[in-house]
Regions:
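Active-site catalytic microenvironments in core metabolic enzymes, especially phosphate/sugar-handling
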Residues: 2-260
Length: 260
């Protein structure tokens, strides 16, 4: 779609349609609703993107004059009780009292080949995907964009910390040059076995659980937990900037830091 000249506003239905056209949420079996989660005002002048629909992000979006918020982690998830109390009540109160729309895309924003978290993390890390793996093809696998190899797991660990600006948890596999790297952002530690089966020499994700350390050592495949938030900072602003340019509205990414 050709970007529209910048105008003062669009309507909520056009914003939702633009996001859905890119994300194709109907293709995914997800843990919560994708698309519009909370309805606010009909006219949209400013879109704020962020990782999680936390109270801090909502308050920052209010201060920024947002009409809509676009996130990766929304408010509603499978298995919730459905009771609106406490922290959930407060987040909803802020959104509804300020008539702010909330849009959320979870797995669709992980999987998108250009705007998604995995694709955008690859851009930041200098990686290039040559294939997919795992349930719903959410995992990416490939190597360095420049065609070189990482000298070993220590070098890859240092480069991850340098690119993401935070320490990583690194479990050493074989001490060998690393050519084939797999990655899946966020809490995708359960994809490690699929990455091993796909032929990865190293796996990058956000979180680690107890079994992955043993698998890394026993299978000789290095495992890197780089932070759930840190690996998923890039999809929401990429999608937000993309649809804002299409619709001629303003966009701002607000990063609420999270050490997890």
């Amino acid at each position: 779609m050709t970007p529209m000249p910048e105008t003062s506003q669009t309507d909520r239905s056009a914003l939702l349609a633009a996001c859905n056209a890119e994300m194709q949420p109907e293709r995914f079996k997800d843990y919560g609703p994708n698309g519009l989660q909370v309805e606010g005002r009909a006219q949209i002048r400013k879109l704020v993107s962020g990782v999680t629909a936390s109270r801090a992000l909502i308050e920052a979006a209010i201060d920024a004059g947002a009409d809509a918020i676009l996130v990766h982690h929304g408010l509603f998830w499978r298995g919730q009780s459905g009771v609106i109390t406490g922290w959930l009540k407060e987040r909803l109160r802020l959104l509804l009292s300020h008539e702010i729309n909330l849009l959320a895309y979870h797995l669709p924003l992980d999987a998108h080949p250009v705007l998604g978290n995995n694709a955008q993390l690859a851009r930041v890390l200098g990686l290039q995907a040559t294939g997919r793996f795992g349930e719903q093809d959410l995992g990416f696998i490939g190597g360095r964009l420049d065609g070189e190899t990482f000298a070993d797991a220590d070098v890859l660990s240092w480069q991850l910390e340098h690119a993401l600006g935070r320490p990583v948890v690194a479990i050493q596999g074989k001490r060998e040059p690393i050519e084939r790297v797999a990655w899946c952002t966020g809490g995708a530690q359960s994809y490690f076995e699929a990455a091993i089966a796909a032929g990865a020499q190293a796996f990058i994700t956000g979180e680690i659980s107890e079994p992955q350390a043993h698998l890394a050592r026993e299978c000789g495949v290095s495992f890197f937990a780089c932070g759930h938030h840190a690996t998923e900072r890039y999809g929401a602003p990429a999608l937000g900037a993309h649809v804002a340019a299409q619709l001629g509205i303003s966009h701002q990414f607000i990063d609420i830091d999270n050490p997890a």
